[in-house]
Design a protein with these regions (language model features):
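P-loop NTP-binding core
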Residues: 1-271
């Protein structure tokens, strides 16, 4: 938990399965949280989808979040790499620590360094009192970058597509957090699972989606399951212009993310 109510609350968005809607979730959650306070979105996925959606398509001449986790002699401060989204209409409330494929090289560079699992946590420490919320995107696989995203966070949410693969990814993500806890790392509280790409045929949910959500509940008893995010081309369109679903007037599609924001705010108060 945050050490002080004045420090940023850090939320990691993690799933060990591709196509889960992680970057979509980060875009929506960070944008919604920016209405509540100053928010920093950290793209910690070398694919850099979040970075591109927020308007930064070429970082060849720019420093990125990769430089903030390098060994001491080459390391930059997070505040040295922060950018405003190109399509910024949020009056500076939402900022971005961008990423590109150089983040993979940075991960390779630190693989033998002691304490490497917490380099992102170390990098964030000097800026925790500059923000109300920090939201971290992560790669869709086990590895040093995902460990860093998890261990830098106070809270964690797991988006996962409504497929068998998605169920496996969600369960594997929960197992990973428990494994890190067993190794005596301080791990974040898991707020719950967001079922994404929930497919419907007209007014009826497809059998596959229904079975996946049932499997999530059975595989992870006691884990909170948020409302699902329906499969929609609207999600893709809003992503590519850097808007949240709420900003686009799609409140029904945004329901799950509004629930996560509410859960995070309550957890921040009650711990």
């Amino acid at each position: 938990m945050p050490e002080s109510s004045k420090l940023a609350t850090v939320l990691a968005v993690v799933c060990l399965s591709g196509g889960s809607g992680k970057s979509t979730s980060v875009l929506n959650l960070a944008t919604m949280l920016s209405e509540k306070g100053r928010t920093l979105a950290i793209d910690f996925d070398p694919q850099g989808n979040l970075t591109q959606w927020l308007g930064w398509t070429d970082l060849s001449e720019d420093a990125t979040v990769a430089e903030t986790i390098l060994p001491d002699s080459d390391r930059l401060l997070v505040k040295e790499v922060i950018k405003s989204p190109v399509n910024e209409e949020r009056l500076g409330r939402l900022l971005l620590a961008p990423a590109d494929y150089s983040l993979s090289r940075a991960a390779d560079a630190i693989i033998m360094e002691p304490g490497r699992e917490r380099f992102l946590k170390r990098a964030l420490k000097p800026i925790l009192d500059d923000y109300d919320f920090i939201v971290i995107d992560s790669p869709p696989a086990k590895g040093i970058l995902t460990y860093n995203a998890i261990l830098a966070a106070d809270f964690l949410v797991i988006p996962t597509e409504c497929t068998n693969k998605g169920v496996v990814g969600a369960v594997s993500s929960v197992v990973l957090v428990r494994e890190l806890e067993d190794l005596d790392f301080q791990v974040p509280k898991i707020l719950g699972i967001i079922p994404t790409r929930d497919q419907w045929a007209g007014a009826n949910q497809t059998r596959m989606s229904k079975a996946a959500i049932t499997a999530l509940k059975e595989s992870l008893p006691g884990m909170h399951i948020f409302s699902s995010v329906r499969q929609s081309t609207t999600v893709q369109r809003t992503n590519h212009v850097g808007w949240s679903l709420q900003e686009a007037g799609e409140s029904s599609l945004a329901k799950a993310y509004l629930e996560v924001v509410d859960a995070l705010l309550k957890a921040k108060v009650h711990g």
